[in-house]
């Protein structure tokens, strides 16, 4: 996969935009995102979508989505969401599960496998895709020395 900080180029037709077989990816917060569609390449105004991979044993450090919703569909693997005030609640999800995260809910996501990645389709009600996300304090972030 190709590491990129810009959105991959999409094919624009009359009212339909297609991104074919993207190999571009972006690393963020312990997650690898396969290039998808957003305002940057599709002209979307309220939606973005891509595929996220959490490596074996990996973690998406605690963060909050400010003023936008997120829906996920897990294609492969199992995750644990630590969420809520102080990350005091926990929920496990696996392949075939749909997940909805309300705006403003602090959460940290762990890949439960040390040998297999987690792969999920991620849709956001924010076309900017990478804006409006704030770090949230967590013991794991401090222990790992993550930003």
Where in this protein do the model-derived segments appear?
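A short beta-strand-loop-beta hairpin characteristic of the jelly-roll/cupin
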Residues: 59, 68-95
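A short, N-terminal "cap"/entry segment at the start of jelly-roll beta-barrel domains
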Residues: 1-46, 61, 135-147
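Conserved metal-binding segment of the jelly-roll/cupin
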Residues: 54-55, 83, 93-112, 124-125
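Conserved short histidine dyad/triad with adjacent acidic residue
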Residues: 35, 50-66
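Histidine-centered active-site/metal-ligand motif
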Residues: 63-65, 81, 107
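Short, charged/polar surface micro-motifs in flexible loops or helix N-caps
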Residues: 42-45, 54-58, 76-80, 126-127
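A short hydrophobic beta-strand segment most commonly corresponding to one strand
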Residues: 49-52, 71, 100, 115-132
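Short strand-connecting beta-turns/loops that link adjacent beta-strands
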Residues: 42, 67, 86, 114-116
